Amino acid sequence: LIVFLVWLPSGARALLIAALQAQRVLVGMIFLFALIALSLLWTAGQRLDTWVFLLINLRGYHPKWLDHVVWLATQVGNMVTAFLLAGLFFVLNYRSLAVEVIFGTLTLWLLVETIKALTDRARPFLALEGTRIIGWRERGRSFPSGHTAQTFFLMTLLSHRFQLDVGGTAALYAVAFLVGFTRMYVGAHYPRDVIGGAVLGSVWGVLAMLVDPYWLGLRF
């Protein structure tokens, strides 16, 4: 949050601070993320994490065609996808939204990488023998899931910006949950990495919503 505030222009920062004072739900979400991060110290939590991860990654039906579909689906959470989406919005004359997507993506990436360095949690394929790896071996640490955080950030922001109804919002979040599931399926993340990423991405999306009037007021 501090990183986000430092990067924001002064006008947007003042707007955000004022809005935060009335956002108890957002504060609760930040607190929830902190609890998830602290739970990494819980031994029983690691055992549960491992059990659920192996259930999704190793057990059950895993045909080759499904592996390919899941690998493609997980790319929705890639930063490249976000930049391509921002480019599309720019071409379609949603320029403030394009800038918001790029700014939010970059600051979220910086935050995720900082938290990963602090928590220093190894990827499951480094700790669990026999883990199935679909695609390439992801670099870096495991908590939180950057792909999941990125997807939840985008879906939260887009749902707000386009004022989607319940059905549209549910469809966007269904995609976000799917990306979270794929991160375990491809062997890149534990369940708590995904849950933490979902909460963090949602927080970033809400923060983007709060400063949305600032971006709408700029000319691009």
PLM feature segments, named:
Residues 26, 70, 96-104, 167-171, ...:
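Alpha-helical transmembrane segments of integral membrane proteins
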Residues 32, 85-111:
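Interfacial segments of alpha-helical transmembrane regions
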Residues 39-40, 105-116, 175-179, 183:
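Alpha-helical transmembrane segments of multi-pass membrane proteins
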Residues 128-220:
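Membrane-embedded catalytic cores of phosphoryl/pyrophosphoryl-handling enzymes
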Residues 4-14, 88-94, 161, 210-212:
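Structural signal for the C-terminal ends of transmembrane alpha-helices
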Residues 53, 57, 90, 112-120, ...:
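Membrane-water interface at transmembrane helix exits
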Residues 102-114, 199-207:
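Hydrophobic, lipid-facing residues on alpha-helical transmembrane segments of integral membrane proteins
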Residues 4-81, 116-138:
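N-terminal transmembrane-helix/juxtamembrane module of multi-pass inner/ER membrane proteins
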